[in-house]
Each structure stands twice: as C-alpha cells, then as structure tokens.
Amino acid sequence: MSVSIKPLEDRIVVKTLEAEQTTASGLVIPDTAKEKPQEGEVLAIGPGRVDDNGNRVPVDVAVGDVVIYSKYGGTEVKYAGQEYLILSARDVLAVVQK
C-alpha cells in the first residue's frame, strides 16, 4: 500500500493493525473493552534526524515492517479517508519478526 504522506526527520507513518475481536477462548470482545492498538505496519519513513555534527541518522525500521509502539505515542491523522498514526522513531519499541 503506497501512501502519499512523506514524513519529516525521524518520523514514521504507520497503519494501525486492528485489535483482536475475540479472546483465545473464543469470547467476543466488545468495542468498549478493547485497548488502543500498539501494533502497526510501517507505510513511510522520514530521512532520519540530523545529529549534533550535522550527520543524518537513519531510522531503524523499513517500509513494510510491523512495529510495536508506545501506547500513547504518535499523532493520529486522517488523510484521504484513511486513518494513520505518525510516530517519532523514539516511540517505536520493537519490530515484529515473522
């Protein structure tokens, strides 16, 4: 999926993955009981931040990676009818290995 949002510096555009609809035992989770998702697919990355010496520090994730991010990290944006999350690289906690 290509997105026409180009993040600046060390920011990352993420499409949030939907939270589980049922528990492992098959119980349906109502919308009011669902927690905010913390997992998403990276759709775009910025060029990286500039350090104190003027060198560009690249972001540690790549487009297509599935990442786990801070629960309250990022800014939710709606663009072209889709909802995205724009995170700082510091808000990314891990890359999911499949």
From Swiss-Prot:
Annotated compartments: Cytoplasm
Gene3D superfamilies referenced in this protein's UniProt entry, alphabetically: GroES chaperonin (2.30.33.40)
InterPro entries, sorted: Chaperonin_GroES (IPR020818), Chaperonin_GroES_sf (IPR037124), Chaprnonin_Cpn10_CS (IPR018369), GroES-like_sf (IPR011032)
Keywords: Chaperone, Cytoplasm
Annotated Gene Ontology cellular component terms: cytoplasm
Source organism superkingdom: Bacteria
Any one GO BP annotation for this protein: chaperone cofactor-dependent protein refolding
Record bears the keyword Chaperone: yes
Main location (coarse class): cytoplasm
Family from the record: Belongs to the GroES chaperonin family.
SUBUNIT field: Heptamer of 7 subunits arranged in a ring. Interacts with the chaperonin GroEL.
NCBIfam families: PRK00364.1-2, PRK00364.1-6, PRK00364.2-2, PRK00364.2-4, PRK00364.2-5
Chain's role: Together with the chaperonin GroEL, plays an essential role in assisting protein folding. The GroEL-GroES system forms a nano-cage that allows encapsulation of the non-native substrate proteins and provides a physical environment optimized to promote and accelerate protein folding. GroES binds to the apical surface of the GroEL ring, thereby capping the opening of the GroEL channel.
Name by which UniProt lists this protein: Co-chaperonin GroES
Species per Swiss-Prot/TrEMBL record: Beutenbergia cavernae (strain ATCC BAA-8 / DSM 12333 / CCUG 43141 / JCM 11478 / NBRC 16432 / NCIMB 13614 / HKI 0122)
Taxonomic lineage: Bacteria, Bacillati, Actinomycetota, Actinomycetes, Micrococcales
